[in-house]
Amino acid sequence: MAKYDEKKQLKCSFCGKTQDQVKRLIAGPGVYICDECIDLCSEIIADEFEETVEFDTKSVPKPNEIKQYLDSYVIGQERAKKSLSVAVYNHYKRINTNKQDTDVELSKSNILLLGPTGSGKTLLAQTLAKVLNVPFAIADATTLTEAGYVGEDVENILLKLIQNADYDVERAERGIIYIDEIDKIARKSENPSITRDVSGEGVQQALLKILEGTVASVPPQGGRKHPHQEFIQINTSNILFICGGAFDGVDKIIENRTRKSSMGFGAEIQGKHEKDIGKLLKEIMPGDLLKFGLIPEFVGRLPILVTLESLDKDALINILTKPKNALVKQYKKLFELDDVELEFNNEALTSIAEEAIERKTGARGLRAIIEEMMTEIMYEIPSDEQITKVIITEECIKDKENPQVERLPEGKTRGTLASNRVKKDIESA
């Protein structure tokens, strides 16, 4: 019940203070609560919530466990998976250590992934977030521009993470952000220019603070900031940033450097194409990234360099068939939902892999190749009840021939077979 003094003045039902003694008194059905009691309740709830979201190092998977999980989804790239597993484990171990009173404060180590298109950079980052059960966001560096110009502010990257954490800022502050196409924001030339580079060096400068760790003000609805809107405050000190890019042309920079260092009497002479790009990338140094167009401060905030190799034919065939979410398994499941069996023969898988290599799209292009070839048969199956099996052959890929089809005799359909199976199951039960 609402409490009244002799002058019928309203009082807080919890602390007993009158409306004159507090800034605000909020009414409910038969009760009142003051702003001071609301603040106290908020503090109690916040303290309890903080205990529930406390990130315990013991719960972080060990590097070998992280790699085993990555192996289930990512084929090949053994060296990259080991490097990422160690880096991610150390990052979350650092979060806990810095909460304790220690003499040494561990600094953050963000990651730079370098590898050809379709080598698995994005998939690696996504899978890491999945195994750690932390919020994850992907951003495209090519959409970012310096503040004040048409395009996205860098703070919009953080908004995506907050949204994926269901606006739970505490969880978002322990999340992972993957910035793709980071090589596209390299400045246009090695020498500083007097003209404004709003999508290159300007974006690198804008990213520096959030990469290192700062309390950023994020507009909750996205878009540009304006002075009359409220902001979400988020501390980026414990957010792990993984930046990825193909860095086309950096192999020539590495090759020039290594060739100069191996010049001289008795030096081993190698042909220009003797080393593939994947092997050259393993020899990358921070100085090569500076020559490519990244500024020194930006390179300094990405101390862990992880390189990925181009995927060969065998790796692409394994990607088609072995992971938990392999494309062949996905399409077989789609056909199974229509009571149709799908089969890829070995020659067909080889042809799909060869086509992806020819298109230079890596693993990313595998789905497009299969989809092009399967569209017609997937269009026909739902309305053709006599088809029971579809076989994909080498000719389907190379010569664009239709898949081989097995059909039921006239008068029989998949629907009648399914109903007969149900009847038998009922009778046997």
UniProtKB/Swiss-Prot annotation:
Basic and acidic residues bias locations: 402-413
GO molecular function, one term: ATP binding
Protein known as: ATP-dependent Clp protease ATP-binding subunit ClpX
Function: ATP-dependent specificity component of the Clp protease. It directs the protease to specific substrates. Can perform chaperone functions in the absence of ClpP.
Region (Disordered): 402-429
Organism this protein belongs to: Clostridium botulinum (strain Alaska E43 / Type E3)
Keyword ATP-binding found: yes
PANTHER family assigned to the protein according to its UniProt record, in alphabetical order: ATP-DEPENDENT CLP PROTEASE ATP-BINDING SUBUNIT CLPX-LIKE, MITOCHONDRIAL (PTHR48102:SF7), ATP-DEPENDENT CLP PROTEASE ATP-BINDING SUBUNIT CLPX-LIKE, MITOCHONDRIAL-RELATED (PTHR48102)
Annotated Gene Ontology cellular component terms: HslUV protease complex
Cystine pairs: none
